[in-house]
Amino acid sequence: MKFVDEAEIQVIAGNGGDGCVSFRREKFIPLGGPDGGDGGDGGSVWLVADENLNTLVDFRHERIFKAQRGVNGMGQQMYGKAGQDKIISVPIGTVVINVQTDEVIGDMVRHGDRLLVAKGGTGGLGNMHFKSSINRAPRQARPGEQGEERTLKLELKLLADIGMLGFPNVGKSTFIRAVSAATPKVADYPFTTLYPNLGVVKIEAYSSFVIADVPGLIEGAADGVGLGTQFLRHLQRTKLLLHMVDISATADAYGNEKVGVGLLPIEQVRKLEIELERHDPALLDKPRWLVLNKADLMPQEEAQALAEALIAELHWTAPWYLVSAVSREGTWPIMKSAMTLFEHQREVAAEQSVSSR
């Protein structure tokens, strides 16, 4: 199934039922008073987070969602039945935006979270409410109120533990295939990955985490160039960023790039850091490890020397790894270290939760 992470829908709440104009008509009571009942309230539209969904693809086929209208009031003070609510299931991680105001009105982060997105109209009053000392037989009733109507933009942010980032063709999809059961498309041209791919990495029988292969970024991504900001947002909820670099991208004797993604390794790092900072500076505060890929394309000693020179030039202090995603060499230690990091993060969060009570 293709991953669809954005959709636009229209939600229409039900109108309230109209109030009724009616009078008692019973034997021996020729001048019965007003007994018109109220209309029922219109149904509302709700979004509910569902852990069993992981895509917005269903909204490509169904875009308009309507709740039921309230039933009109009736005589003998009978109230109209309320309209049935419309429940729309969305994946966990869905951000809800009001298109008219560009305001974020909800963020569905837990299974079962409910968000009211269109409130049903209130039912109208029947004529029994308008009786007074000077108007014993009112012939007026109030119509039901109109239900709310909105156009919503749904954006899905992946709930992954690890986000992989890097320029196109550095080997992200190959890496995720190597460490998980995911099978993203792999080919030797840019933007092979057009949708984020999720892979589950199992370390032990009961230890696992989710890794997201986000489509390749290019210079100007923060401004929407290439696949743009629609995928940068997926990195915001991750616990760890793996910054993949093609270590085989080298220059010839004249200084012209001749191998790899078209950028020297140090440029791959610095240019992508600029894009992250422009999109969301908080991304640079996340744990970020450097993964130097394609070490298999050169002798081992040369790859190690290039890697150490790059780390020194960057003044890199965070963890870094020299790997070959194709042969899987060096990939597994990264996953084990990531699991150790996540366990530590959970322990710290638990301690902070206890101390704040």
Curated annotation (Swiss-Prot):
Mg(2+) binds at S173, T193. PROSITE patterns: G_OBG, GTP1_OBG, OBG. Its main location: cytoplasm. Its cofactor is Mg(2+). Its EC number is 3.6.5.-. One of its GO terms (cellular component) is cytoplasm. GO terms for biological process: ribosome biogenesis. SUPFAM superfamilies: Obg GTP-binding protein N-terminal domain, P-loop containing nucleoside triphosphate hydrolases. One of its GO terms (molecular function) is GTPase activity. The keyword Nucleotide-binding applies. InterPro entries: G_OBG (IPR031167), GTP-bd (IPR006073), GTP-bd_Obg/CgtA (IPR014100), GTP1-OBG_CS (IPR006074), GTP1_OBG_dom (IPR006169), GTP1_OBG_dom_sf (IPR036726), OBG_GTPase (IPR045086), P-loop_NTPase (IPR027417). The keyword Hydrolase applies. Keywords: Cytoplasm, GTP-binding, Hydrolase, Magnesium, Metal-binding, Nucleotide-binding. It is found in: Cytoplasm. GTP binds at residues 166-173, 191-195, 213-216, 293-296, 324-326. It is an enzyme of class 3 (hydrolase). Residues 1-159 form the Obg domain. It comes from the Bacteria. PANTHER family: DEVELOPMENTALLY REGULATED GTP-BINDING PROTEIN-RELATED, MITOCHONDRIAL RIBOSOME-ASSOCIATED GTPASE 2. Belongs to the TRAFAC class OBG-HflX-like GTPase superfamily. OBG GTPase family. Monomer. An essential GTPase which binds GTP, GDP and possibly (p)ppGpp with moderate affinity, with high nucleotide exchange rates and a fairly low GTP hydrolysis rate. Plays a role in control of the cell cycle, stress response, ribosome biogenesis and in those bacteria that undergo differentiation, in morphogenesis control. This is GTPase Obg.
